Each structure stands twice: as C-alpha cells, then as structure tokens.
C-alpha cells in the first residue's frame, strides 16, 4: 500500500520519459519489417531508459536483491540477447520487482521487469524466460510507438484523482468507469497493446526461447496459468471474471492465446529446468509485503503505519506500493496519503483540487469534523455531473500525527456514498502487539511424499479459503491432475 512518505510528483515525468522513448524508437524503426534485423538499442534510448527506470522502481516497490533476483536477472539477460537489441548481456538490465501483482513489462533502453508474484506463479525456468522474452519482443518490434496515438496509460496505483480528473474533464464517462470497475492498486505502468501485437510478441518470444534452447511450449503453459489465476482471483474477489487485472488486462485474453502458442511450438522440444527453477525460488516472498500493508479477507492492516480498516461486504481490495483500492459494483475507493500541514480542512480541499484539476464544477461541501475511534477526522462530499448521471465524490481524512494524515477518496452514484460509511468508521490504530503478529507469506517448495495428495498438500496453504483451488493454480494442475511421490510442488506458507 503506502509507505510513510508523501506521494511523489514524478508520475507525469515518468510518462513523459516513456513517451519520449516511444518516439525515439519510432524514428529508429520506421522502416522496420518483421524480416529485417532488429535495430539495436540507441544511446539516447539507453539514457532515457535509465531515467525512467529510477521512477519505475519507485512506482513498483523497488527491485529485490539477493540470489533470487540474481537468478531472474541471469535468465532475463540470456533471453534478451536472443532479440538482437543488444549483442551482450550487459546491454540489458533485468529487475525483480517487489510487487504482489502478476505483471511483467519492458521499456526501450534494455530495461526488463517482472514481479515476484508472477515469478511465484511460474513452474519452470522456460516459463520465466518466455515471459521476459515476450516483453523484450514488444520493445524489439517497436510496438510502443506504433501504439503511440492510441496508447493508454494504465497507472494502477496512480491517484484516483487522475481518473476522476479525466472523467470530469470529459475524457470519459464516470458512470461507465464505475460500471467497468476502476482498476487501481495493481502497480501497472505500461502501454496497452493490441491483440495482434500481443500475438506477435508471443511468436517472437517463442523464437527467442527456441534459440536459447528452451521448450517453446512454456509460453502456452504460462498463459494457461495466468488464465487460471485470473479466473480464481475473480472467484475469490466476487467479481466478473471478465474484469481481469494487471498483466492480463494489458496482455489481452491469455486463455485464447494458449492454443496459438501451442500450435506454434508444435513438436519442438527443449529444456525447462523445472527443478533448478523451483530450488531457486524457494522462500520467495508471496502476496502482500507487510511493509506495504496486508489484506486479510475484508480487513487491511499496515504494521509499519499501525493502522487497520475493514472494507464493506461485497467489495474486494487490491494492494500496492502507494495505495490500497477498494472495488465493487456500487463504488470504488482508495486509501492513500498526501502532504499534511496540520489542517484537515486544508488537506481535504487540496485533495479535491487535485481530483478536479482545472474543472471548476467539482465543489465540495463544507468540511465536517468528527472523531473515529479516537482519531481526529474530517470529510466532505462533492457532486459531479457525468454523461451517465450524477456521482458523489467523497474525501474522508484522518490525522494520525501533526505531520501525518491519510485519506479515503471514493466515488459512488449520487446519494449512495453511505455504502462506505462502515469502512470510514472502521479506521483505527493498531497496537504494537497486533503489528508484530502480521507475518509475510512465502513460497515453500516441498517434495511430495508417498502419502501426500492434492488435498493434504493444499491443506497446508496459508489461507483461510480456496486452499485447493490456490494450490492447483499455483502448481499448474488441472482439476483432474494428481501428484506423485518425488514430485516437487509449491506451497504458500507463513514465513518462519
């Protein structure tokens, strides 16, 4: 979620940098066809990629270090060299991001990223190489600049205000945004590619796999795992499975791409390095990092900031580096922080000003003061007209210290803001003892014993619901699949 620092104003700079990268790539690849050699990374791309990299790492919780990160880096560089963007491994920078979202992407300049959560979903080294190769392929094929005019910035975890500002300025309909679900909290900063570009990246990625000696079928098996994870997430969160988050939302329809990837792979074989991969990722942090807060059912608890709240029934939460979002059919909200000068009234008006931008029609009501579980608090609501009717925008702020405040910002249909009242009233401080009881989850690779079954292994998963389904998806097992003695499988357990 959020760390104990104010949100940085660097996202606009970051997007400007990425836009510049796309334009430079366009100039270098304007005459490129799929049959010519790939233009190599230019010095200008490398310089601007380095600039964007700093801010991307901030947006995504930073890069992990240690043996697991080094392993991902090694695999990523090996596969990236196959693209022709650079002749040496040192031409590329590969980062394992501390994010609990299934995501991977690359930017011009040789910068490649994957999240620890996506790595945890994988089941062999070839799948890791396939995902990273797919992302490198987008850069090699210069897809970003070919989508420049229609590219969408998906800064999930970006301020709700950026969405509302666009809506209120007429860039989209807020009613439609509510109906589709505002995708926040998922730490995604990339360009949305067309289906044809995704298929081309799949194809190029499989070519890189084959050149590197990997099994090209790994692209299909990873896509199948992503499709299964998307479906499971929707089931657990009580949302429509068509509302896919993160990597799947910018990499359309992974399920339908499985068949195409399988057909392309044909009878070609190669290495998967399954046991090596599982050994290397053993102990990898999985799910929320307590330093960013943890979601447990309907409750969010942040041990470092010593706060907790409960989302309303029927809503699901998504956590990230700088915010936690609360999403449902009847509204969306986000908890974050902003600079605080000691006045809740001024704080709330500043939040509304950021939401509205230049739109003078968003006028909040008078700020109301209250106390929530002993915490000084204040709130205000503004009504806005959209093409699909009126909506209410509510800001509810809490003073945790003279120099520190947090706030919810929420949107609902007009007159329906009460749906979040229970959540607003649930905010509380937690004790040191409560904070110490928050334990991270991690991947635990185990060897199946002679008496083990899917059910017995799943019962060891550190979740109160969906243990069987989570175990099967995590290990790429279909409903009819069983486990065999000696086989290595992944569990998610509480860190010791």
Predicted regions and their residues:
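Short alpha-helical segments in extracytoplasmic peptidoglycan/chitin-binding modules
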Residues: 454-462, 468-472
